[in-house]
Amino acid sequence: MKQLKSLFIGFVLAALASPVWAADSAGSITITSPANDAVLQSGAGNKLDFNVHLGPNGNHVHIYVDDQAPIVFRDVSHCPCSIDLPKLSSGKHTIVVKEATSSHAMTGVQGSVTATVK
């Protein structure tokens, strides 16, 4: 009976720890600049700074500014990463960085910010 109780406790501990192991193997994307709700200058000269930790299926990232075609960024092994954003018009913009597989399928790992251009 004591062995069975120890075995049960072992299973419970393993089950509780498994979400931690899953989180370690998942990728992550953090946008460091611009901050969420930042105010940017109109025109060119705005940068996007971000960190990427690819998940097991990740190969590169796609960067979206509003509904524009994605910017494919492959050199994520040396992050922190930085790119020049395309020229932005006045108004509110959403910037999303999404992890993609080698065949460009989205993995679900992403980071996003909203910024206003004055």
Predicted regions and their residues:
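Short, compositionally biased P/S/T/A/G/V-rich stretches that sit at domain boundaries
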Residues: A23-Q41, K118
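Short strand-edge motifs at loop-to-beta-strand transitions and within beta-strands
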Residues: C79-I83, V113
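Surface-exposed, short loops/turns at beta-strand junctions within beta-sandwich domains
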Residues: L85-K92
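Short beta-strand segments within Ig-like beta-sandwich modules, predominantly Fibronectin type-III
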Residues: I71-C79
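Structural beta-strand segments of beta-rich domains
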Residues: S42-L48
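Beta-strand signatures of extracellular beta-sandwich domains
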Residues: H60-Y64
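Hydrophobic beta-strand segments within extracellular beta-sandwich modules
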Residues: I95-V96
